[in-house]
């Protein structure tokens, strides 16, 4: 089955745009997203620009705060604390990766859980696995929406997750468990990965490797 991701994304943006418009009318306030970007990695800059474009498109107030690669950890932590206290900022996103001299874990934990757009804060991770309301990492959430659009009822489906990262594989598994799927998480040490995949109704690949496993001839 081919899924038209662009069409589904456009529909979701319209739904979000309407929701934001309703929030504006109700609270007389424009929700705001602030992104902290450190360094000049081309991939990060493109990713952040796309986020800004999408945010503006749905009616969010968007701000990008840029720092050189030489910025200190203390400066980043101070800015995060400032944004935590700023009532005009609804969401905070620190673009990863960060330079090696900055402790990623420390920065993530400094973000207020209520403003943690990426869903990386330990409190949001715990809430997701416990079935409570939480922010959810965007990649697994996007995959979840795609799956639900083409198959609304997932009861009893066997889902195979390839990858066990905290950013993608694990939250993806939690989302599908909430939909009553039978979930198997596979990884680089899994024996006979192809066999596991062939038994699945749903396969989500969350690994940064091309042609990680072949399911059928000319397919991955």
Residue spans for each PLM region:
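Positively charged, low-complexity intrinsically disordered leader regions
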Residues: 1-25
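Short beta-strand segments enriched in small/hydrophobic residues
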Residues: 30-40
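Short beta->alpha junction loops
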Residues: 39, 63-73, 188-189
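Glycine-rich phosphate/diphosphate-binding loop of Rossmann-like nucleotide-binding domains
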Residues: 44-50, 137-212
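Short beta-strand elements in bilobed, periplasmic/extracellular small-molecule ligand-binding domains
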Residues: 55-67, 183
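Short, well-structured alpha-helical segments in soluble
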Residues: 75-86
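Anion-binding alpha/beta catalytic cores of soluble intermediary-metabolism enzymes, centered on
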Residues: 93-154, 172, 211
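Conserved small/polar residues in nucleotide/adenosyl-binding loops
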Residues: 213-220
